[in-house]
């Protein structure tokens, strides 16, 4: 029988993968008690558009390898470089520039969630 990974396991694996690929300040927040549309946020600081594209490809490859589905991918800025969101259902990945991360401060906004990393 195949080993079924929990949403938390997947969030932590994605976070580690991002950190291994030079994303900075990678955090995982359990927001399952705060909303009805996702369980975990993975938040990471990116350095450039090229860095974002590489990380997004890795996340998409992870999703495919783990029989998951991407629900939505959004660019949250006109340039598309400041905040990129990949929604895979129970996990939402936020890839943000340092400026966007400081400005939006998702960790503070979702302070009621349990920080796992």
For the regions a language model picked out, list residue spans one by one.
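Short amphipathic alpha-helices in soluble, non-transmembrane regions
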Residues: 55-60
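Glycine/charge-rich, flexible interdomain linkers and switch-proximal surface loops
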Residues: 25, 29-35, 71-90
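N-terminal first-folded block
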Residues: 8-40
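C-terminal binding/interaction regions
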Residues: 92-117
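N-terminal presequence-like segments and adjacent domain-start helices
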Residues: 1-7
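Short, hydrophobic/aromatic-rich beta-strand segments within well-structured domains
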Residues: 41-44, 84-86, 92-96
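A short interface-forming secondary-structure element
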Residues: 43-52
